[in-house]
Amino acid sequence: MTLLPHALSRLLLPALLGFIALPGYAFDEFITRDGHRLLEGSQEFRFAGIHAPELHRIEDDARGTCTADPRGWGQYFRWPTADEQANWIKALVKSGHRAMRVYVLSVATPSDAECGRETHILPPAEPDAMPRLNEAAMVHYDRMIALSEQYGLRLILPFIDHWKWWGGREQLAAFYNESADDFYDTNSKTYAAYQDIIRQVINRTNTITGRAYKDEKAIMAWETGNELKASTEPFVRKTAALIKQLDSNHLVIDGTYLKINKFALDDPNVDIISNHFYTTNDNNNPEQVQQDLQAIDGKKVYLIGEFGLRDADGLNAIMQAAVHTEHNGARAAGAFIWGFRGHRHNGGFYWHKEYTGHYSYHIPGFPEGEPNEERKVVDLVRKAQAQMAGFDSALPLPAPEPPVLRAIADPRVRIDFMGAPLGRRYRIERATNMAGPWKVIGDNISDGLQEYRPYEQALFRDTGALVPGQMYYYRVIAINESGESDPSNIAQVVLP
């Protein structure tokens, strides 16, 4: 029997399992660094993916804009359910993702109550005290880490945002009547609060695994923050040193944006240098990969933390540069295209529309996403994943697992089901007896609408000749190019 190398077996396991559910395995080791390479055990660790920023907090675009938010971008948010988080992580892993960078910890703003929002970081209980972690929020963060361990996904976790969208440095500084720029001043109250947040997070005990975050192998790296473009040498030096002092198990990413800091290249506590590519910054091109690798010159690991918001051919050119470009033997460890959204608990997908007109991508890709080149983007990412593992092309996707059918009040109004990871289409069946026979009432049903609005739309309605007072039974089967799932759970309803 020929044994696959360790790294390849991790990548191929979902495809080789086919109809079998993913195992609940624990990682054997932390991800480590050897010069410009990441290692999983003794094997080089490289990854490509579609960036999934919201594994721990969701912008609910279907609800529209909260006008009470004075920032002019008042978004509604919600916490993910356990079903949602498991579904998303399985979709990522089964499609070939080995690692994922999520978005930051959110910071409280004055308009949160009016917009029905909760955040991860709350104001101090007393003036000039330290911020507090919101336990109601952090249990979802705990579960994200636990599920990533269970299904085999390594996490990159940034702390605070340069920007205000989820609440960032400006909102943290407001707790202390300081300015947003004081965040980068290592003598400020805001920076002291930032340091305390880092301490609280790293030392937190996961309520699901029972382990401190600093002992969680699912965590690959801590990132100082998201797009911290005003980072100074004292800021990076003190922050990286604090993280390493608290946590000797995990790697540290300099979260600076748009430049390679020479001082970070010489800092023994910084392991990974990251950059983000966007057209608005004039760097959304494959040549930027070579420029960054030359600037880093093999002193650190190189990560393309985000790129996107352009056509699929352009994305592919950058992704192929990430896979193949070398400078004195150093290559990008990973690259993420912005951005992914997953299934909703009761059906359809979450979505987000960018200012460029691009939509978030839904895995495994759907005909409804053709204007967004969705399937093409998913496929180019899967090809890059395979190439990083030493293959020319990706293996077929595994067949989907069963979807989850939700309770039905009136099948003539709506039948809701949570789509299966990797399901492309669905068959809906009805019977008048639990044991059948089953009649197909909907075939080739898609849940892949780009802008699914659950408050106004239904995934499916039973338009057959139904008899009031009759008991009906329903089930759903997921299908993709590799096969079909077992039937879902059965939902029964007496027609009103």
Q: Where does each model-flagged region fall?
A:
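Bacterial N-terminal signal peptides that target proteins for export
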Residues: 1-15
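N-terminal signal peptide c-region/cleavage motif recognized by signal peptidases
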Residues: 21-23
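Pro/Thr/Ser/Gly-rich low-complexity, intrinsically disordered linker/stalk tracts
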Residues: 388-423, 468, 483-496
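An aromatic-rich alpha-helical recognition segment common to small helix-rich domains
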Residues: 403, 415-417, 428-429, 462, ...
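Recognizes extended acidic, P/S/T-rich segments that occur
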Residues: 427-468
